[in-house]
Swiss-Prot record:
One of its GO terms (molecular function) is protein serine/threonine kinase inhibitor activity. InterPro entries: NS1 (IPR004208), NS1A (IPR000256), NS1A_effect_dom-like_sf (IPR038064), uS15_NS1_RNA-bd_sf (IPR009068). This is Non-structural protein 1. A motif (Nuclear localization signal) lies at residues 34-38. Inhibits post-transcriptional processing of cellular pre-mRNA, by binding and inhibiting two cellular proteins that are required for the 3'-end processing of cellular pre-mRNAs: the 30 kDa cleavage and polyadenylation specificity factor/CPSF4 and the poly(A)-binding protein 2/PABPN1. In turn, unprocessed 3' end pre-mRNAs accumulate in the host nucleus and are no longer exported to the cytoplasm. Cellular protein synthesis is thereby shut off very early after virus infection. Pfam families: Flu_NS1 (PF00600). Homodimer. Interacts with host TRIM25 (via coiled coil); this interaction specifically inhibits TRIM25 multimerization and TRIM25-mediated RIGI CARD ubiquitination. Interacts with human EIF2AK2/PKR, CPSF4, IVNS1ABP and PABPN1. Keywords: Eukaryotic host gene expression shutoff by virus, Host cytoplasm, Host gene expression shutoff by virus, Host mRNA suppression by virus, Host nucleus, Host-virus interaction, Inhibition of host innate immune response by virus, Inhibition of host interferon signaling pathway by virus, Inhibition of host PKR by virus, Inhibition of host pre-mRNA processing by virus, Inhibition of host RIG-I by virus, Inhibition of host RLR pathway by virus, Interferon antiviral system evasion, RNA-binding, Ubl conjugation, Viral immunoevasion. It comes from Influenza A virus (strain A/Hickox/1940 H1N1). The dsRNA-binding region is required for suppression of RNA silencing.
Length: 237
């Protein structure tokens, strides 16, 4: 096993412990608490994959961080913080929408790389919008926290979430997963649209005038491609 993989996991465990203490003292905002819950699932998955105990890893991670802090000067810390790119957390969904339980009459699930796609194939002839909470860096989607598909009535009928056992995904991974979800929902004559925020940062427009990321012709072509992909890769339980 790569020692860097182990040390990275150990440090992540300790940093999660620190963030949990912050949350316990009611010092974390909604995005902070949201990431805390998601990262907990991710760490459990990584620990299972690596065969490492989280409690032991947390203690070792603390030692690693303490050693680094002893060697770190205040000036070096300032320089590091100044040079690091800052990411932003964007929210289409409220905490209630993110944490709400939902049920499927005809559940279908597909794993696409590091992302899990779930949808209810019993939903037909509905107008659906995709909303997501995610982080952005350099004006591009960096990390998807959670994406959900909502009907006009507010019912949840689909979801894309990162797999805890496979941390890390790219902007292309997210776009591909969205394409599969849209294709699956449109197969039952649903009308699907993507929120403006998600569309802006997942599909960056190359037009300087700020036009839409896809022309109507491009959208029709993408829809045909998606449907073809769905036929080849039917979503399985």
């Amino acid at each position: 096993m790569d020692p860097n993989t182990v040390s990275s996991f150990q440090v992540d465990c300790f940093l999660w412990h620190v963030r949990k203490r912050v949350a316990d003292q009611e010092l974390g905002d909604a995005p902070f608490l949201d990431r805390l819950r998601r990262d907990q699932k991710s760490l459990k998955g990584r620990g299972s994959t690596l065969g490492l105990n989280i409690e032991t890893a947390t203690r070792v991670g603390k030692q690693i961080v303490e050693r680094i802090l002893k060697e770190e000067s205040d000036e070096a810390l300032k320089m590091t913080m100044a040079s690091a790119p800052a990411s932003r957390y964007l929210t289409d969904m409220t905490i209630e929408e993110m944490s709400r339980d939902w049920f499927m009459l005809m559940p279908k699930q597909k794993v696409a790389g590091p992302l899990c796609i779930r949808m209810d194939q019993a939903v037909m002839d509905k107008s659906i919008i995709l909303k997501a909470n995610f982080s952005v860096i350099f004006d591009r989607l960096e990390t998807l926290i959670l994406l959900r598909a909502f009907t006009e009535e507010g019912a949840i009928v689909g979801e894309i979430s990162p797999l805890p056992s496979l941390p890390g995904h790219t902007n292309e991974d997210v776009k591909n997963a969205i394409g599969v979800l849209i294709g699956g929902l449109e197969w039952n004559d649903n009308t699907v649209r993507v929120s403006k925020t998600l569309q802006r940062f997942a599909w960056r427009s190359s037009n300087e005038n700020g036009g839409p990321p896809l022309t109507p012709k491009q959208k029709r072509k993408m829809a045909r491609t998606i449907r073809s992909e769905v036929r080849r890769n039917k979503m399985v339980d």
